From Swiss-Prot:
Listed name of the protein: Elongation factor P
The UniProt record lists the keyword Protein biosynthesis: yes
CDD domains, A to Z: S1_EF-P_repeat_1 (cd04470), S1_EF-P_repeat_2 (cd05794)
GO BP terms: peptide biosynthetic process
Gene: efp
Sorted UniProt keywords: Cytoplasm, Elongation factor, Protein biosynthesis
A Pfam family of this chain: EFP
GO MF, one annotated term: translation elongation factor activity
Species annotation: Clostridioides difficile (strain 630)
A GO term from the CC aspect: cytoplasm
Length: 185
């Protein structure tokens, strides 16, 4: 059990049978009345973020989240298949489970998959991805205004904003957490 008074960023707990992650918290001690903990937490299954205040003595079951490194194998049109690096077990995941990560994952790359009570619920791509630009408008010579970007489609199908000097065929480094261009590779 974990009490609301022990909440810190990154603490996991169960609320209404759902795994939750503390995103932000603030211990509030008003001049009058009882202290409370203002908490912003994310439901790890649905991705919904909520804000709620709790009594510091309120207790919640600790959510045990298992994390495994798994290799992305392929997509059969409906499901995305991942293989456990240790026991070579393959698991199929649907689009809702891989939605955010699959934009930056190439086949055979390793991703982090989180499990709750033995069921996979979240896929996380590596923090940085090096991807080839497959489609973008050509840069126009003389267009040198600072911080001007254009849309570029990378090999996984994701669309990212890149500087004007990036052309089709260039490899770019992308921060997968924000989807932002970092550099040319």
């Amino acid at each position: 059990m974990v009490s609301a008074g022990d909440f810190r960023k990154g603490v996991t707990f169960e609320k209404d049978g759902q795994p939750c992650l503390v995103v932000d918290f603030q211990h509030v001690k008003p001049g009058k009345g009882a202290a409370f903990v203002r908490t912003k937490y994310k439901n790890l299954k649905t991705g919904a973020i909520r804000e709620e205040s709790f009594n510091p003595s309120e207790k919640f079951p600790k959510a045990v989240i298992d994390t495994r490194q798994m290799q992305y194998l392929y997509n059969d049109g409906e499901l995305y298949y991942f293989m456990d690096q240790e026991n070579f077990e393959q698991i199929p995941l649907n689009y809702e489970q891989v939605e955010d990560a699959i934009k930056f994952l190439k086949e055979n790359e390793v991703a982090t998959i989180r499990f709750y009570q033995g069921q996979p619920f979240q896929v996380e791509a590596p923090n940085f991805a090096e991807l080839e630009v497959t489609d973008t408008e050509p840069g126009i010579k003389g267009d040198t205004a600072s911080n001007v970007t254009k849309a570029a489609t990378v090999e996984t199908g994701a669309v990212v904003q890149v500087p004007l000097f990036i052309n089709t065929g260039d490899k770019v480094k992308i921060d997968t957490r924000t989807g932002e261009y970092l550099s040319r590779v």
